């Protein structure tokens, strides 16, 4: 199965989370994982993927302009139905607790629903999600005054999302 992680990152925080998600997905031996910054991400690759995970820093509860521009270019894939039944998941970072993590993830999920994708979140029984995460995806607060780019809890949350996407994708593609 092929999984594509696409991210926008301005201060490296979201890149660290994207890399953790890719690591988690790679724990499944059947997963072939690709990861690209949105500036290098090729929308033509999406047709060949079984799962697509995209994310960005939250900007007042909305998608970063870099990722939004990229998503807006997916119209022809929608017209051709190329992403229908592909697994999708999202992730986001913000600088403050009230930076709009969940609103940003809602905004990231919406285009996936329009594309006909099967959106996967993190259920409450995922240990990493119980106290630190969100049901909508991996959302991590990275305070600007912190010495570390990402907390260990944030990295573990990212890995958990990657594992979940690869597990669900494996289950869905096993019968093909």
UniProtKB/Swiss-Prot annotation:
All residue ranges annotated as the Flavodoxin-like domain in the record: 3-162
Gene Ontology annotations for the cellular component aspect, listed alphabetically: membrane
Classification via PROSITE patterns: FLAVODOXIN_LIKE
Pfam (any one): FMN_red
MF term (GO), any: FMN binding
Domain of life of the organism encoding this protein: Bacteria
PANTHER family: FLAVODOXIN-RELATED PROTEIN WRBA-RELATED, FLAVOPROTEIN-LIKE PROTEIN YCP4-RELATED
Name of this chain's protein: Uncharacterized protein YhcB
Species annotation: Bacillus subtilis (strain 168)
